[in-house]
Structures are given as C-alpha cells and as structure tokens.
Amino acid sequence: MPELPEVEVVRRGLAAHVTGRTISAVRVHHPRAVRRHEAGPADLTARLLDSVITGTGRRGKYLWLTLGDGSAVVVHLGMSGQMLLGPVRNENHLRIAVLLDDGTALSFVDQRTFGGWMLADLVTVDGSDVPAPVAHIARDPLDPLFDRAAVVNVLRRKHSEIKRQLLDQTVVSGIGNIYADESLWRAKINGARLASGVSKAKLAELLDAATDVMTDALAQGGTSFDSLYVNVNGESGYFDRSLDAYGREGEPCRRCGAIMRRDKFMNRSSFYCPRCQPRPRV
C-alpha cells in the first residue's frame, strides 16, 4: 500500500496540473470505486460536474482535491490505486475518468479495487481544514505542525509494541510497514519493544528517523516494488534500491554486517538486524 512519500509524490504531481481547472466531464466506470460515497455514483458525478479544483491536500496516506464549494474529493489509493494524467494505457482497470476544461484527462486506475473516491465536507481540526472522514487521522512527520514532543508523550503511555504504534494512524500518520521497518533500523530499535519502555530521547530519535527516511524516499519518487505504485505520469519511484531493512532477510546489515532477519507481524513481516536491533527479553 502506498505510504506517505508515495501519496505526497502523487499530490505534488496533481497540484501542478489540476489546480484552478474546472471539471467538464466525469464518468464512473466501476461502482466499487465510489462505494464510500454513500449517495452513489450518480450523485458524485453530478456534484463534480462544473466544479473548480481549488487545490490539493494530504494527511498521512489520505489525499484530496479541494473544490470551490468547500467540499473535497477524498482519494484513498488502497493497495493499487493510481491517479494518472493523460491517456490510460490499460483501460481494463480504469475506474473513474475525469476531463478538465483544458483537455487534461485525470484517471483513477485501480487493479485490485480496494481504493476509491468520495465527496466530503471540509472541517477545521487543530487549525487545519481536512475532509471530515480524515478528521481522526493524526498529523504526519512531514506536516509543518507535527508536534514531536506531544507524540513522544503519547507513545510513552502505550503499553504495546512500538512498531504497532508507528502503524496506528491516530498516533502518527503516513507510516506503513516499509517505512516503520526503515525508521526502526535507523534508530536501532526492535519493533517488538514496548513503546512505554523506550526512553523519550530514543522515541524522539525514532520520529526523527521516520522524518528523514520519508524525506529521502520522497526525493527518489517513493518506493515501487511493482507497477502498482506510480506517479501521475505513470513512472515508478526508485527508493527500493536504498532500503536498509525492508525486504533484506538473509542479507548483511549495511551497518554492522550481521545477517538481517524477518519475523511475522500482524499478517505482515518485520525486517531487522539482530545485532543492532536486539529483540526484547521475554
């Protein structure tokens, strides 16, 4: 699933091309793509037609297009959603097609159909306007108003695994399995440690590591392991070449040379160095 850097790459690409444009045509090709919009495809189409896109926004893994009437198109990419500008190469997975007043085609393509669009009102939360369905999502480490000290205090009160807390979007958003493992590796913390047992200084270091690794990933267009994640031009990111932990089971740690390991975690996997990131004693 795309994480913060991948979604931000898409947001930036959209911002440069759709801001200020008017929607002149909309077609929903698959009803599942708008299943979160309770009023249905016809309502979404009617409300989008002739709307002006006034900007783009993102919090964590959620992306949205703000409209002139004060509402927003909330986009969740799911496992394989793509927001593409220009002609679509494979229309088999085209779910929503939008035509802008300058002739630009904006398409939502989703092979697995886990993602989707919905319309929602904007609400003000802690001084920022966000779509109502996103109001419960915490700020992410790249948000200018991200409060590291406050998040550290929240984590210190959590008597559960630190990696589980990194993935909790109500604590800190935007971090998924890949960047959680990368952040934990950089901070030399095993994800199985209890958050409450990690010092405030070390938790601050971990959040700084998350900020740094996602900034690095953003600079390289995000992480693409297959063709499912691409930017608005259909191009893959290449941060997968720079990963230090994720997917490196059986390879030497880039820092100490120990052989990287993989453990099962929440129907996923955790990758770590047994020397730099020793598991907590039971």
Swiss-Prot record:
Zinc finger motifs (FPG-type), residue ranges: 244-278
Cofactor: Zn(2+)
Transmembrane segments: none
Recorded GO MF terms: 8-oxo-7,8-dihydroguanine DNA N-glycosylase activity; class I DNA-(apurinic or apyrimidinic site) endonuclease activity; damaged DNA binding; zinc ion binding
Listed Gene3D superfamilies: 1.10.8.50, MutM-like, N-terminal
Catalytic-site annotation from UniProt: P2 (schiff-base intermediate with dna), E3 (proton donor), K61 (proton donor), R268 (proton donor)
Biological process terms in GO annotation: base-excision repair
PROSITE patterns: FPG_CAT, ZF_FPG_1, ZF_FPG_2
HAMAP family: Fapy_DNA_glycosyl (MF_00103)
Subunit composition and interactions: Monomer.
Purpose: Involved in base excision repair of DNA damaged by oxidation or by mutagenic agents. Acts as a DNA glycosylase that recognizes and removes damaged bases. Has a preference for oxidized purines, such as 7,8-dihydro-8-oxoguanine (8-oxoG). Has AP (apurinic/apyrimidinic) lyase activity and introduces nicks in the DNA strand. Cleaves the DNA backbone by beta-delta elimination to generate a single-strand break at the site of the removed base with both 3'- and 5'-phosphates.
Protein name, per record: Formamidopyrimidine-DNA glycosylase
Organism: Mycolicibacterium gilvum (strain PYR-GCK) (Mycobacterium gilvum (strain PYR-GCK))
